[in-house]
Amino acid sequence: MPYIGSLKVNQFRNLADVDITPHSQFNFFFGQNGAGKTSILESIYYLSVGRSFRTHLPQRLIQDNTDRFLIFITLYNGTQFIPLGVERDCHGDRCLRINGETASSWSLAAKRLPLCSLSAMSHRFLLDGPRVRRQFLDWLMFHVEPSFFSIWQRLQRSLKQRNAALKAKLPLGEITHWDKMLVEDGERLHQLRQNVVTEFKPLFTQMLQQFLPAYPLIGHYFRGWSEKYSLMEQLQINLKQDLQRGYTQAGPQRADFRLTLGDLPAQDILSQGQQKLVTYALHFAQGLLLKEKTGISPIYLIDDLPAELDANKRDCVIDLVNCLESQVFISGIDPNEIRLPPHSTLFHVKHGKVAAL
């Protein structure tokens, strides 16, 4: 089980100088709104994937009146602790270092530091467009399917080139030149996603039964083009409309994973709190599948766990996370709202300062 053995954060949001030793299992950060609780979780997330889960404007992550931020951890990988850190300045330059060496790609950090992030807006998983749900599936494949990332990268390149040709209204031959590569990688990506969904669904059902036994939701995977046609046939059928719109309408970039109860979308039936529990069930099942396939448990970041959940559901979440045998970082306002297990560390966050209790 990977876990963070130490965490240092400098000049990130309102965190001027944080240096803590997290517990290898449960860590609960409490304090008033604006104290910096979420920023702790956000800093770990940024180190893993190179972006924030709160803003698309990275300059906002740098503390006021400073010119850079630094995030540094020591990460236990099962045999030893390795250093992992990132520095970003106000000009947009950033440096990621893993085990003392500059990393060429953020995918190297994501591989070493697998995270499942559950933010205060997690219920939006069901409400937002399909992109977030594709990312959910692709996270799994990135960690369990060795061939996924190279396939995904090639697909993005061919799709970008085809869309540029469509937008520029180039001759048909220059547009369809990209179809063969797009189809080859698109079909392979679809098959990987389909395989992952098949393995994932029973685990999701198992998790959902713990949270919402009265709501037997069903997951449906849509590959991104009609079941009646191959991807090549669909591209040929859509070519005229693609030219009019300036982009490729069909393909794995349009895939989705939707949840229904009977014939109705889950988001039309469930309350906001129930949607939050569904998202928890999805991500806990995600972690279970990762552990089944690789023996590695992800680290969980759970922001504002108590919000919209009654005491029984909060306890249920804690019990399930405990069974996952993962390191967990949880935030909330009141420590009395969470029944933490004995193997926990409580941190008080106030005005950007963090102290273990």
Curated annotation (Swiss-Prot):
A Pfam family: SMC_N
InterPro entries xref list: DNA-binding_RecF, DNA-binding_RecF_CS, P-loop_NTPase, RecF/RecN/SMC_N, RecF_2
Gene3D superfamilies for this protein: P-loop containing nucleotide triphosphate hydrolases, RecF/RecN/SMC, N-terminal domain
Keywords noted in UniProt: ATP-binding, Cytoplasm, DNA damage, DNA repair, DNA replication, DNA-binding, Nucleotide-binding, SOS response
Subcellular location: Cytoplasm
Cellular component GO terms, alphabetical: cytoplasm
Positions with a binding annotation for ATP: 31-38
Transmembrane feature ranges: none
One GO term (biological process): double-strand break repair
NCBIfam families documented for this protein: recf
Family from the record: Belongs to the RecF family.
Protein name in UniProt: DNA replication and repair protein RecF
Organismal lineage: Bacteria, Pseudomonadati, Pseudomonadota, Gammaproteobacteria, Legionellales
